[in-house]
Regions:
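N-terminal Rossmann-like NAD(P)+-binding domain of SDR-like oxidoreductases, especially those catalyzing
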Residues: 1-138
């Protein structure tokens, strides 16, 4: 991706991975905006990165609309998390990710984003090492 002067939103941009992504995008000439609620992301991760930081909750439609407005590319990294054990024992709390994802996709599309890059989690993979049964493959 040619990042030169692209307007790029990184949701969850103050996280460990998100902040490194922001740093690389800025080095490649992108104009970076971060949408972050700082529940687990750290302000210090952004201290040395020339970016615009919007603090709010992406579950709030008005914040999601404002955060995505004018962005050409959206890297969607924001999510509730906690690892496999957390997901197994807190399924309702984790279902908010589906709402959050849908909201980011909807507003990014409405506001004219050219690309959305969605980063999921290693938690989506099964914990067993068993192979998928051939009967499940179509």
């Amino acid at each position: 991706m040619n990042s030169n002067n692209k307007k790029v939103l990184v949701t969850g941009g103050a996280s460990f991975i998100g902040s490194h992504l922001c740093e690389q995008l800025v080095q490649r000439g992108a104009n970076v905006r971060v949408a972050e609620n700082f529940s687990s992301g750290e302000r210090g991760h952004l201290a040395h990165i020339e970016c615009e930081a919007f603090e709010g909750d992406l579950l709030d439609p008005s914040f999601c609309d404002i955060a995505t407005k004018g962005m050409e590319v959206v890297f969607h990294l924001a999510a509730d998390h906690g690892g496999r054990g957390y997901i197994d024992s807190h399924p309702v709390e984790c279902s908010t990710n589906m709402v959050l994802d849908g909201q980011v996709f909807r507003y990014a599309h409405r506001n004219g984003a050219e690309k959305i890059i969605f980063a999921s989690s290693g938690c989506v993979y099964p914990t067993s090492r068993a192979l998928i049964a051939p009967s499940y493959i179509h």
